[in-house]
């Protein structure tokens, strides 16, 4: 078992080194290997959040969302998993056209607000709760305007299902900017 722990640690260190050099492909490969070898759920959860953030840096929002959701599944109270997930949703908005790209910000906002709430109750989170609140406020600026909602026949308060990107299938609430 100690050999396994050494292997996990070695992979983490290799991932860190490649990440520092900007080689995100190799970094994520080693992080995935470390996750596969990790037996401790708490450590696996931390590695998944790290993988999500590395995938974001590599401009892979879908892979980032998958890793963040896996971390969330291990611990639904992990504010950092929500923090990474919200960023993944927001990063994917540019790949969705028109109103759909703006609608993703509803989900990013909701997810980042959840992150802020969870991080505010986490003594180890430092300033991340405020960073999450600031990011949520920024995502609000991406919401469609009242006019855009009107022309797309969307009523404020109505339910809306995202149809693009890693947030596809998530139901949210229509809100103008």
Task: Spell out what each predicted region is.
Residues 1-9:
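Single conserved hydrophobic/aromatic residue that forms the stacking wall/gate
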Residues 42, 56-59, 86, 91-100, ...:
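Short coil/turn linking the two alpha-helices of tandem helical-hairpin repeats
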Residues 10, 44-47, 81, 125:
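TPR alpha-solenoid repeat register
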């Amino acid at each position: 078992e100690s050999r396994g722990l050494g292997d996990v640690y070695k992979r983490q260190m290799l991932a860190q080194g490649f990440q520092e050099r900007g080689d995100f492909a190799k970094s994520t490969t080693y992080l995935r290997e470390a996750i596969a070898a990790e037996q401790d759920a708490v450590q696996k959860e931390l590695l998944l959040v790290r993988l999500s953030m590395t995938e974001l840096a590599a401009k892979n929002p879908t892979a980032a969302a998958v890793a963040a959701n896996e971390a969330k599944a291990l611990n639904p109270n992990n504010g950092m998993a929500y923090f990474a997930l919200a960023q993944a949703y927001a990063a994917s908005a540019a790949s969705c056209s028109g109103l759909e790209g703006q609608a993703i910000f509803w989900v990013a906002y909701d997810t980042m607000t959840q992150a802020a709430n969870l991080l505010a109750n986490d003594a180890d989170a430092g300033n991340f709760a405020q960073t999450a609140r600031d990011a949520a406020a920024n995502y609000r600026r991406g919401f469609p305007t009242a006019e855009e909602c009107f022309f797309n026949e969307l009523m404020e308060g109505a339910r809306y299902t995202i149809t693009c990107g890693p947030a596809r299938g998530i139901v949210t609430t229509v809100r103008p900017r």
